[in-house]
């Protein structure tokens, strides 16, 4: 099929001490968002963890971990898609492609 429109996917960086004010605005404006974790162990800051919990029921949240370690986001109660082997830009493009097909139910398979 021919793709006429790509989905809107935002990107936000997370770090220790992040107040997530900007992230809240971005997540309210996009169909999906890529969160880039810049912590040493790959975890999200407490404020970002809560924000992701709040929004992941109505938008797809993809987490890219810059540390190279595999972090268990489900243990933090997060319903996110992990992109352990992708850069943030690759994850953003993949999310845009996933948004073009509303029949895709398991996004994680595209991010493995």
Where does each model-flagged region fall?
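Active-site catalytic microenvironments in core metabolic enzymes, especially phosphate/sugar-handling
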Residues: 1-112
């Amino acid at each position: 099929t021919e793709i006429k429109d790509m989905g809107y996917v935002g990107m936000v960086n997370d770090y220790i001490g992040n107040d997530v004010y900007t992230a809240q605005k971005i997540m309210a404006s996009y169909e999906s968002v890529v969160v880039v974790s810049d912590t040493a162990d790959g975890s999200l800051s407490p404020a970002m963890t809560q924000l992701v919990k709040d929004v992941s029921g109505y938008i797809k949240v993809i987490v890219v971990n810059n540390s190279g370690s595999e972090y268990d986001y489900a243990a933090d109660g997060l319903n996110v898609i992990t992109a352990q082997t992708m850069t943030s830009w690759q994850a953003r493009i993949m999310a845009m492609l996933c948004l073009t097909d509303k029949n895709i139910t398991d996004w994680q398979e595209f991010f493995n």
